[in-house]
């Protein structure tokens, strides 16, 4: 998968290209990340990349010409196959369904805003989609872009050692993940659930599924609005609720 990033701070993306799962994906040729800095497309000796907004008000906007030229350079490198995404608080909120959609793309160009944002006409003429990672304000689009890259890269075949790792992640099936345990068997008086030590794979599967459903019910009940539970899941949820009520 190829990703182009328009950013005033390309050095930040070493966190993606040099470390962890995404770093290994880059090293193994499964993921390619290229950056374009609008400062490299300026024509003044100060490398100016911000400009005053029409109508006044606080803050500055990213200057149109360097930003637009950087986007055009990324498009030229990617070809017609690239989808241009602007990371914006006004965009569609990123969730696992959205990540799955984006992971089907061969090429993505991510535009990272700074200051008060970008000229609306850039969005109208150069951007295909706007995406947001949440209802809060950040200093720029770099962290959202890295979040998107990391989440999408996990779904690229071969990036994770086992595809089951992605399939069992929180939200992969619309549910939160179940609890996980490793050694030692007892920690500060708390034991690993006996079922996980039983060796009975079917019982372990059912326990994990029930815990996943129950955790979603307790912590993120709104997620059930978009889920159609199977008969098995409905039964496990009813059992979980009954056991929770008894222990309350």
From Swiss-Prot:
UniProt-listed InterPro entries: Alpha/beta_knot_MTases, tRNA_m1G_MeTrfase_C_sf, tRNA_m1G_MeTrfase_TrmD, tRNA_m1G_MTases_N, tRNA_MeTrfase_TRMD/TRM10
Molecular functions per Gene Ontology: tRNA (guanine(37)-N1)-methyltransferase activity
Gene Ontology biological process terms, A to Z: tRNA N1-guanine methylation
A single GO cellular-component term on record: cytosol
Protein's cellular compartments: Cytoplasm
Recorded superkingdom: Bacteria
Catalysis performed (reactions): guanosine(37) in tRNA + S-adenosyl-L-methionine = N(1)-methylguanosine(37) in tRNA + S-adenosyl-L-homocysteine + H(+)
Alphabetically ordered keywords of this record: Cytoplasm, Methyltransferase, S-adenosyl-L-methionine, Transferase, tRNA processing
SUPFAM superfamilies: alpha/beta knot
Enzyme Commission number(s) from the entry: 2.1.1.228
Annotated positions binding S-adenosyl-L-methionine: 113, 133-138
NCBIfam families, A to Z: PRK00026.1, trmD
Family: Belongs to the RNA methyltransferase TrmD family.
The protein's role, per its UniProt record: Specifically methylates guanosine-37 in various tRNAs.
Quaternary structure (record): Homodimer.
Protein name: tRNA (guanine-N(1)-)-methyltransferase
Species of provenance: Shewanella frigidimarina (strain NCIMB 400)
């Amino acid at each position: 998968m190829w990703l182009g990033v328009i950013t005033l701070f390309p050095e930040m993306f070493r966190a993606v290209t040099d470390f962890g799962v995404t770093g290994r994906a880059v090293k193994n040729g499964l993921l390619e990340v290229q950056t374009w800095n609008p400062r490299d497309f300026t024509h003044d000796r100060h490398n100016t990349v911000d400009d005053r907004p029409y109508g006044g008000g606080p803050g500055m906007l990213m200057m149109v010409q360097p930003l637009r030229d950087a986007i055009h350079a990324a498009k030229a490198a990617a070809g017609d196959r690239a989808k241009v995404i602007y990371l914006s608080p006004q965009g569609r909120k990123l969730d696992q369904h959205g990540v799955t959609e984006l992971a089907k793309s061969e090429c993505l160009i991510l535009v990272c805003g700074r200051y008060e944002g970008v000229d609306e006409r850039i969005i109208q003429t150069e951007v295909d989609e706007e995406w947001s990672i949440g209802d809060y304000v950040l200093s720029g689009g770099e962290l959202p872009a890295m979040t998107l890259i990391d989440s999408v890269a996990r779904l690229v075949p071969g990036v994770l050692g086992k595809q089951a790792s992605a399939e069992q992640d929180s939200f992969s099936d619309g549910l939160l993940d179940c609890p996980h345990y490793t050694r030692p068997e007892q920690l500060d008086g708390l034991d690993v659930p006996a079922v996980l030590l039983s060796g009975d794979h079917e019982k372990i599967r059912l326990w994990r599924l029930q815990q996943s459903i129950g955790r979603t019910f307790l912590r993120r009940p709104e997620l059930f609005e978009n889920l159609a539970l199977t008969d098995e899941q409905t039964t496990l949820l009813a059992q979980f609720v009954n056991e929770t009520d008894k222990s309350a």
